[in-house]
Amino acid sequence: MKIIIKILYRIYQLLIALPLFALITIFTAITTIIFQHWRNSWWLHDIQAFWSRSFYYLLFLPVRVTGQENIDSHTSYVFVANHQSMADVFLIYGWLPVIFKWLMKAELRKVPFIGSGCKAAGHIFVKRGNTAAALQSLQEAERVLHDGVCTVIFPEGTRSENGQVGRFKRGALQIALDLKLPIVPISLSGCYEVMNRHEVFANYHPVHMHIGKPIDISTLAEENIPTAIEQLREAVIEGMDK
């Protein structure tokens, strides 16, 4: 019986959910491009958030979010999250209650509609392995991240192979230090079970996002950065059990 339900669920995804999500994606991208002058407005952000939420709505996936009370929507933060699958993006974009810009790999700029929409929305593209381009991205972030506009980073750098939290790279902490912004851990669970990096179809599974408490790193000394990175990783792992 479970096999039959799984087959029917995949047929539904292919014939109904995917076409509807594609239409919503095109509508959201076009709307964002047309109204990009208001890229930091709540009404445009809400349209983009609905696009992300529609991924979960169309697949009937239960979503639970905790820790919203830990942050202030008028304060700029650097959010760091574990990266289990593509489903992470839709969970964060749909339910993180702040206006934010992704720090995302430059290759995504070439994806039809999504790349153009992300550029119009003001998300920050980073060329990995290019120091000069990374510096330019940091300078762009300095211009954008103020008055409650935040950024979200996946410090592992790539999706998890097994759902476990990998090693955190220094970049996220360095950006928070350079911009003098508090850093907030986000813990995601269930997204790997929904769609890991090797799967094309989604699986039915509940997901959870926990927003941790802001961490002030403005006085962090250089020699303490490796320890702080590991403590941040531990905070993300701990939040997965909330």
Residue map of PLM features:
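Thr-Gly-centered strand-to-loop micro-motif
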Residues: 66, 103-105, 127-128, 155, ...
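Hydrophobic alpha-helical segments typical of transmembrane helices
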Residues: 51, 88-91, 104, 113, ...
